[in-house]
Amino acid sequence: MKKNLFVTKRDGRKEKINLDKIHKVLNWASEGLDDVSVSQVELCSRIQFYNNITTINIHETIIKAAADLISQDTPDYQYMAARLAIFHLRKKAYGQFEPPKLYDHVKKMVDLEKYDENLLKNYSYKEFLQMNSFIDHWRDMNFSYAAVKQLEGKYLIQNRVNGKIYESAQFLYILISACLFSQYPKNVRMNYIHRFYNAISTFKISLPTPIMSGVRTPTRQFSSCVLIECGDSLNSINATTSSIVKYVSQRAGIGVNAGQIRALGSPIRNGEAFHTGCIPFYKHFQSAVKSCSQGGVRGGAATIFYPIWHLEVESLLVLKNNRGIEENRVRHIDYAIQINKLMYQRMLSGDQITLFSPSDVPDLYKAFFSDQKKFKKIYLQYEKNKNIRKKTIKALDLFSLMMQERTSTGRIYVQNVDHCNLHSAFNPELSPIRQSNLCLEITLPTKSLNDVHDTDGEIALCTLSAFNLGKIKSLDDFKELSILSVRALDEILDYQNYPVLAAKKSAISRRSLGIGVINFAYYLAKNKVRYSDGSAHNLTHKTFEAMQYYLLEASCELAKEKGACSLFNHTNYYLGKLPIDTYKKYIDDICNEPLHLDWNLLRSKIKKYGLRNSTLSALMPSETSSQISNATNGIEPPRGFISIKVSKDGILRQVVPEYKKLRLQYELLWDIPNNTGYLQLAGIMQKFIDQSISVNTHYDPARFLNNKIPMKQLLYDLLLSYKLGLKTLYYQNTRDGSEDDQNITSKSITEDICESGSCIL
């Protein structure tokens, strides 16, 4: 590099380039890291220097040089690049490396209207000094490079027009804690703030995008999962559409139950007109979902639910594929098919499935969710009733069409409605589960609206977080983490605003939470067990037993302190039923691990005090949160040791945790021979989880004759999922070779559907 080059400082001054300054920063960034070379980063950087380059560009150049060196053999470059990026970020935010004192920072941000003014009203100067003492800014150096770029892109308060950053990560963590516990008694709240800050800033607990980016700002809307049920009237359809727009404008993910909409050709007003069927209204929903685009961000995302016995099912199943024309396709939303035991039995016995318009059989539609015995009885009666419009189709043909479309699009999902109601947190007679959410992990009661202000309707919301299994040293750790998660998320329900009254009614009366996990693949590798061979069964059983037990215990303690949720009597917990009472007993055939905790003691406590929250657990996808925590995604096996994601900031490489130590213990997705082991582990988890799991299936055509996945295999996995008691199936991933080059996932499928980040972590 020529030493007579000049640089332009951040304040506009020019001076000769000082190589020692750069060298000093690089030495600092590499301290304590393995297999990183300062000279190698300098070598890569020098080529790109030019006269009058700005110090900002120099910094960005050396960051990119370090990031480009991230590989399986040299994973610590992800931390070197991250430290350089943190240095740069703080310079942009504060004009210096050292962050300001917390009170000074909050005062300035409130004056700029970036932070909620209630922070200064709720806490004294002395309390800010105390919170400042809790902060460990060096924890910023624990982020990977991909995590820093996610923080910059999604979480940190900024001006999205000019790119100005206003804060760094530790202020985010301490102020989320301060906001959520602001209404706790003054004699205990600082203790909770300190504990919660430590848990989230050390990645033991992961929070979703709406909370991470929104709590501490004047905007108090943190919609996670939104479930909206649509009735069979124009008023209800329009109310559904209006509700979709309100929540999509907040970048929320939407689940829509459109199963009641009558079929094509059904009479309207006693035959005065005939119905146009489902497809025009699905298009209406699609337009609503895609209507809001903020600053060039793509519109929202939704999954539509309908029963497999709907009269239009053959036309609905193909709505997402690339064949057909625009008039008979609705490709920009996803679909979930609702199935129960009788439908599976018809397929296995080689029988027919009879299709109806739900409007002709309203009692059948109701029983489909609330009473399986009654459903079968009514279904058989309607099949014999010659006065009701119907159509029969061979069950195997219908299931094959469904699985064919699931394979070709990857995004035809499955909801087993009987499992959702028989192994549920809710009493199906009072609060049946009639749909799920965008990502198929939430199972909460809903009720259709007649207008957007309808106080009788119910829109379900669920508030999410996750435990990082990689940080669990003992199963007893779940006790403290459950106390903190349950209390913090419960506070959000009262802290946030609600754009639709029916959503507030549901959230406040049911207080449903969905707490899941990240880093399961690392957890298995660390414990030297695998997805595919059954060796992880007992560990998984013990882990998820402890998780659900301590979540319920924490909610029960909170109910003792603050009272049970007002609709606690709508839950199975109210009846004394726990998840261990209602799970699919086939699980006992594949896992003989006994229960280790005192469930009868817990049952008696719940009977005495109730629960503060109707539900506690759900296992969601966790793309973004996993990157922040440098963890593997949810319960999923990694596709490769290093993931490469192409973003607006360039290529982001992230290496699985402890790659060098555990590379022989990790089981990569495409090395797993089939879905059986993964599905069995999900079934063991579902034994304890009181909502559902975003369960994916994966197929490598190269493993099959003529590179074609046999329908027999697809149906086998579908039936196995049902046999294991799984409530829902999410993506079907088919290996096409495009990701084999260093496992590139240029825009992961989860990130693509869940752009809002609301229904995922």
From Swiss-Prot:
Domain ATP-cone: 5-95
GO cellular component: ribonucleoside-diphosphate reductase complex
Enzyme class: oxidoreductase
UniProt keyword list: Allosteric enzyme, ATP-binding, Deoxyribonucleotide synthesis, Disulfide bond, Nucleotide-binding, Oxidoreductase
PROSITE patterns from the UniProt entry: ATP_CONE (PS51161), RIBORED_LARGE (PS00089)
Active site: 437, 439, 441
Binding site residues for GDP: 209, 437, 441, 623-625
Binding site for dTTP: 232-234, 262, 269
Pfam families to which the protein is assigned, alphabetical: ATP-cone (PF03477), Ribonuc_red_lgC (PF02867), Ribonuc_red_lgN (PF00317)
Entry EC number(s): 1.17.4.1
UniProt family annotation: Belongs to the ribonucleoside diphosphate reductase large chain family.
Function, as annotated: Provides the precursors necessary for DNA synthesis. Catalyzes the biosynthesis of deoxyribonucleotides from the corresponding ribonucleotides.
Name this protein carries in UniProt: Ribonucleoside-diphosphate reductase subunit alpha
